[in-house]
Amino acid sequence: IGAILFERTMDGTAGGKPVPAALLDKGVVPFIKIDKGLEAEENGVQLMKPMPELDALLARSKALGVFGTKERSVINSANGAGIAAAVAQQFEVGRQVLAHGMMPILEPEVNIKSETRAECDAILLEEMLKNLEGMDQQVMLKLSLPVQPGTFDALVDHPKVLRVVALSGGYKRPEACVELSKNRGIIASFSRALLEDLRHQMSQDEFDAALGEAIDQIHRGSTQKA
């Protein structure tokens, strides 16, 4: 199990310990979100904004025991040049992360509302495979669930990919879990879908039951494949 933290969460404490150390004590692997948001759309994609202080953040994160990073860009339409640029940027940042001895999760998200999703998936796969050939270390990938189940099998099987995880990307949890179950070797990295049924006014028992049900459903989608 892993947890992706915001920078301010990483810098906080839990039970008198830094949050990353507290997570590690419970067997949870900490990652940090490093991107600073998205640029305006160009060529059908939104690249990541510049991260001029990234090396300093990575050094601090590593010292706190953080295992890896996550960085998100968005693909809105099937523009070959745009998708190539988004993937190239992801790998460029990934190499910077690897240089600090950390594991990057590359996240070129395909917008599930795109009218050209299937074409986006195909171009993304081609560009990912092309860039992976130039890698001498493993990376992780966080991808939108594809239109055609099994589209990303070649990434799941690639020797330079440690793990492929899926984002829920706007799907409601039941639908996200059904789509996840159709894709072998891919596990969930859901946030919105995990938390969607939780409410502030719930009692502790209600909260625990709702969260437990969500975890069980997501676990089934990750492990019981159609």
Predicted features by range, described:
Residues 1-67, 75-77, 127-143, 147-226:
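Alpha/beta catalytic barrel-like cores
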Residues 69, 73-142:
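Eukaryote-skewed repeat-based solenoidal scaffolds used as protein-protein interaction platforms
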